[in-house]
Every structure is written in structure tokens, then in C-alpha cells.
């Protein structure tokens, strides 16, 4: 058997090779191009095990050769630190540490590194779309803040709701005779409107790409507060609820479970774990009032806990409760028990009508009944 630890970069990767029944160690660096990849392929086979640390290009990289080897393990960065691979020095040393960990795990049969699930191409595409989604939202927010700041500096104390309302935008553009102020406001307004248009086009593509997961979307949107886009975001993060041991594992992966440290009789509650994905909880946290108001049980619980817990703690706990319910819905493949048939039907009818505009993203299976 051959054990390969790979330290991956954007333009090259360094491999450390260890062998069964041998202390021999070989290290080689390949370019991340056609020539380098073919040279790498010649060094691996069906008796080869590979360990790669998860980075931005890892999933696309391992897809190239996963069928050529016995197994590819993609390791979570935070999890690697917890099992004793800190203090990175050089590419060769990094690759060697990974290879040693891999060999120890395979030879002993004792799992030391929990692998990261390599998402299918469709999920990777959704995640890429949502990365752009978050970038555009941040840029829109920054642009609005700058316009608001300019107006306040010049004694125009309008609220953001007024400034960026459709009716007031023309007035805001012509609000001052000062050339430089007017120039900046109009420049930023042009930028804002361009970003908003791009954002709308992006949402359209997200909805189209998410249509592959219609059954899950139909289940998730049965919960008050979850839109089609939020449902697609949850799917992009979790892939499949069946890969999680239980609801606690599911909630932890979505960064809603705090880390707990204890010594003797002292227990410290720390921030939520970072060894997971944060897209879903970011969008879900924006709809907490809808979740609370649409669920009498949650509403009573929030009122009770809010009497003796800080608002931030209650907010995160509510997120955790919602995520736990989402897990049960996906696991059991059933609608939310407080779902509103009228609102849910309206959401799904609008989505299916949207998809009907492009037959590429719509099948007879999901057609709207007359």
C-alpha cells in the first residue's frame, strides 16, 4: 500500500509518499496543470490512499483522480488541528505530517481523521452561487451605508428606508447643488442600482439551479419563514440530512451549537464551532421573527427563556431549535407540523410558475395542477 499526503496550493501541490512495511519517504512537487497532473497520476494506483486538507480548490482537485486510487480523504482544517497537526512550517513538512496521519489511520484501522464529504457537482455549483450572493449583498450594504453617511455629513438626516425607497431615489440624486456631493451620490446610486440588478439576476440563477432539489424545497418551505432561496441555501450546506448521526450533529455542522469546556466542577460555554458551514444559519437568522410568530410552541418558549437569558443567547438558541426542526423534517420527509397549507401552496405555486418560463429547469413531475 502507498500513503500520500498532499499539501495543495492554487498553482502547485506537494506530495509525500509513505509505503507499507517500509520507512522510506519520497517527496515531490507537481504543477497544477496538465503536465503536472499526468506526472502525478503515474505515481498512484488502486493501492494508494490519499489525504488532502480542505481548501478552496480541494473538491475540484480530488474529483480528477478519486477513481484512480483506493480512497481519498478530505480533512477539515479545524479537525486536523485538534488531532495534532499544528505549526505548519514548509510544504514538504505539511505533506509529510498528512501522510503520517493517514498511514497511522489506515494501518491501525482506528479512525483519527473524520473525512469531509465531497459534495456532488450540483451542490458545489450552488455553493459557488451563494458565495457570490453573499459578496453582492455585502457590496450593496456597503454602498448604501456610504450614501447614508454622505447625506448625514451634509445635514440630510433621512432614514435608510426613505433614501432607498423607489419613490425617493430621484429626489436624493438631485438633493444638493454642491457639485462634489452630487457627483458622489449619483456615482454611488448608479453603482447601487447596478449591484441590485446583478443581485436579482443571480437570485434567478440560484432558483433555477436549485430546481434539481424540488422534493427537499417543498418540505423546507412548509415551515413559516423559509423562502425558496433559504431552502436552497440549507440544501447547499447540508447536502443530505441522512449523513448526520443525529439532530445535534446536524445543528453543530450548521454552526449553531456552542463549544463547551469543563474542568473539575467548572463549565465554560464558548462560541459556536467553526468546523461547519455558516450560509444556512446566516439566512435563517434573518427570519427568526417569522419562525417565532408562526409557531406557538416556539413563541412561548422564547418568552419564557427571554426572562433570564441575554438576547444574543436566546437568538442563537432559537436558531438551534429551528435547525433541529429542519433536521427532523428532512430526515422524516414530512412537512412542518405547524405549516400553513395556503401560504405553502402559494410559495410553491410561484416557484413552479417561475420555473415553467424555462423548460430546461422544469419537468412534468413538478407541473402545477389545474
Predicted regions and their residues:
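Low-complexity, acidic/Ser/Thr- and charged residue-rich accessory regions of DNA metabolism proteins
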Residues: 265, 304-370
Amino acid at each position: 500500500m502507498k500513503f500520500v499526503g498532499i499539501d495543495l496550493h492554487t498553482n502547485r501541490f506537494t506530495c509525500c509518499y509513505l509505503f507499507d512495511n517500509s520507512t522510506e519517504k519520497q517527496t515531490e512537487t507537481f504543477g497544477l496543470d496538465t503536465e503536472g497532473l499526468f506526472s502525478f497520476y503515474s505515481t498512484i494506483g488502486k493501492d494508494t490512499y490519499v489525504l488532502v486538507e480542505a481548501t478552496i480548490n480541494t473538491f475540484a482537485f480530488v474529483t480528477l483522480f478519486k477513481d484512480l486510487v483506493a480512497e481519498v480523504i478530505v480533512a477539515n482544517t479545524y479537525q486536523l488541528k485538534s488531532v495534532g497537526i499544528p505549526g505548519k512550517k514548509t510544504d514538504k513538512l505539511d505533506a509529510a505530517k498528512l501522510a503520517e496521519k493517514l498511514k497511522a489511520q489506515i494501518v491501525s484501522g482506528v479512525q483519527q481523521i473524520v473525512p469531509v464529504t465531497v459534495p456532488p457537482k450540483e451542490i458545489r455549483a450552488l455553493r459557488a452561487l451563494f458565495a457570490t450572493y453573499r459578496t453582492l449583498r455585502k457590496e450593496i450594504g456597503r454602498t448604501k451605508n456610504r450614501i447614508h453617511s454622505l447625506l448625514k455629513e451634509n445635514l440630510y438626516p433621512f432614514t435608510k428606508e426613505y433614501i432607498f425607497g423607489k419613490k425617493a431615489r430621484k429626489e436624493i440624486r438631485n438633493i444638493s447643488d454642491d457639485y462634489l456631493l452630487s457627483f458622489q451620490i449619483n456615482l454611488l446610486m448608479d453603482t447601487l442600482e447596478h449591484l441590485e440588478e446583478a443581485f436579482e439576476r443571480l437570485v434567478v440563477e440560484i432558483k433555477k439551479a436549485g430546481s434539481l432539489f424540488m422534493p427537499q424545497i417543498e418540505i423546507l418551505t412548509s415551515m413559516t419563514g423559509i423562502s425558496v432561496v433559504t431552502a436552497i441555501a440549507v440544501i447547499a450546506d447540508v447536502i443530505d440530512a441522512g449523513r448526520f448521526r443525529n439532530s445535534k450533529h446536524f445543528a453543530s455542522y450548521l454552526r449553531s451549537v456552542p463549544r463547551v469546556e469543563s474542568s473539575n466542577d467548572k463549565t465554560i460555554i464558548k462560541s459556536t464551532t467553526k468546523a461547519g458551514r455558516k450560509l444556512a444559519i446566516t439566512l435563517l437568522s434573518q427570519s427568526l421573527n417569522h419562525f417565532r410568530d408562526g409557531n406557538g410552541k416556539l413563541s412561548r418558549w422564547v418568552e419564557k427563556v427571554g426572562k433570564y437569558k441575554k438576547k444574543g443567547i436566546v437568538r442563537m438558541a432559537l436558531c438551534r431549535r429551528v435547525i433541529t426542526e429542519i433536521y427532523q423534517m428532512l430526515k422524516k420527509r414530512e412537512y412542518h407540523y405547524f405549516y400553513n397549507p395556503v401560504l405553502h401552496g402559494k410559495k410553491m405555486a410561484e416557484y413552479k410558475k417561475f420555473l415553467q418560463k424555462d423548460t430546461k429547469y422544469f419537468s412534468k413531475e413538478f407541473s402545477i395542477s389545474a
